[in-house]
Amino acid sequence: MMKQRLGFFLAFVVQVFSIQLFAYNTSIPRDTATDDTVNIPKDWFLRDPETDHLQGISADKAYSSLLKDKPSKTVVVAIIDSGIDIDHEDLKDLIWTNEDEIPSNGIDDDKNGYVDDIHGWNFIGGKNGNVAEDTYEVTREYGRLKKLYENVEEKKVSKKNKAEFALWQKVKAKYDHDFKSNKDQYDQFKQQYDLYDNAWGTLNFCDSVIRKSMGGKSVMKSSLANVNISNDTLKFAKETLSKVLENVDGDIEVSQFLAELKDYLVQLKEGVDHYSVAVEYGYNLDFNSRTIVGDDPNNLYEKGYGNNDVTGPDALHGTHVAGIIGANRKNAIGIKGIADNVKIMSVRAVPNGDERDKDIANAIIYAVDNGAKVVNMSFGKSFSPGKEAVDKAVKYAESRGVLLVHAAGNDGDNLDKEPDYPSRNLKNGVEAKNWLEIGASSYGADADLVGSFSNYGKKSVDLFAPGVQIYSTTPHNSYEDLQGTSMACPATVGVAALLMSYFPNLTALQVKDILKQSTRKFDGLKVTKPGTTEEVPFSSLSITGGLVNAYEAVKLAESIKPSPAKK
């Protein structure tokens, strides 16, 4: 009822202030804070479908009924992301430490090519700071290809350059469309924010004026008629509030609506900030973040650049991911992560913008060389000009028995038709065997089981995992709900790490197979296909047609004979 009233309230704000608004979409295309009006347990993703009637991963059930008092080994999990708050109360005891490196002595003690890499490495930093924002890959490709083909007619393109020219046409079309779309969204959010910010200020002033005239009492709709007009200011305040509230049913306290309007302003500001970054940095052809790093961006195989600040300027995303995987299950504070015996390695390579292939390749190699058994990769983009370097890193991880788990993305796209990078499909036509692609699911076993934003693909996405309204760690000892395939990915990584910990003789490929074979199926269930209103079989949206489940995975692992240990 309160939200309905706020809707009337906002409508009358527009009427009173006589400003025409654009239609707008308040959905911001990234992993976002969720609507907390849905009353579900904060730890729903750990719960069991049978006992709790929530489509969680049954982690708590696995621990209580299958793993109780069983021994486990510590597993190193690498998180390639925006950075992690390594001092967070629920993570600090689980952060990986490079025991072969002496802190702060300015020497590469372990000779791994990285000086003072105590808790990981930052590939988007330099001697004088860190990259916060960066351009999108489509912007970088647009700038590169524009120099070659902007004024070239297709008929004059040599046979050797036909493929690159076709890429230019694709890149140009996407850049032009996306830049305009983001600029329009920015303008719309900004116009609305300015309108409602002005309205809030005016109405707050009116409320305070009338409140003062009434001896400090709360201003109700019903009390406005009793306000004695003794000056022009009171007259303005009474007329303005009366006009705003005249068609709203029931008696209303103005201060309550002002509080809700303030909350709405926060949402609008989030939109303004997001699209401002996109326009100012993401699609800015003149912006160059690599002056901070000091490397050669065109040298895909350069090593040794970066710094050891594994937290960075904005560790929200990476910290949230880390908590899902392994927040301390034993300290009775905050939340419980999925895996109970992990060390988390922070490898910073993802800015507010698109990650660079060079950094991702180096990040994967760093994780593998320093003992990670599974790597979380909650990022992605539409173009990959340095794919060759990433592919080599993926193959290197495969050769070393390291599992790579990647978020499918949040565009509501079919990845069978719209590729997302990095990918298991290597440039030479070979498919990486150590790869899992993860879509996002929700808490109810109904048409809304799949996250409305999630990418999918019968040939491309392996399975789904909880990614809607996920409560986890955020910087400065805080906790927050976020959603996205970026949350589904660590939910899967957490289960993988759990298996590796309690069944240490299993190989990465065996763990991958167990995760896929043990998914929970939903025979006959039709769900809303992301990005549409069409209902399709849930089984048609991924390879397995199922949700990751820790309990079922542990049961299956107990029945599998491990591969012989290497001598």
Report residues per predicted region.
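Active-site glycine-centered loops adjacent to acidic/histidine catalytic or metal-binding residues
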Residues: 81, 409, 484
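Extracellular S/T/G-rich loop segment that most often corresponds to the catalytic His/Ser-adjacent loop
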Residues: 290, 402, 423-501, 505, ...
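Mature extracellular/periplasmic domains of secretome proteins
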Residues: 63-71, 312-315, 336-339, 354-376, ...
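A cross-family glycoside hydrolase active-site/sugar-binding cleft signature
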Residues: 348, 376-380, 407-408, 439, ...
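C-terminal subdomain of the subtilisin-like protease fold in secreted/lumenal serine endopeptidases
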Residues: 368-370, 374-377, 386-388, 433-437, ...
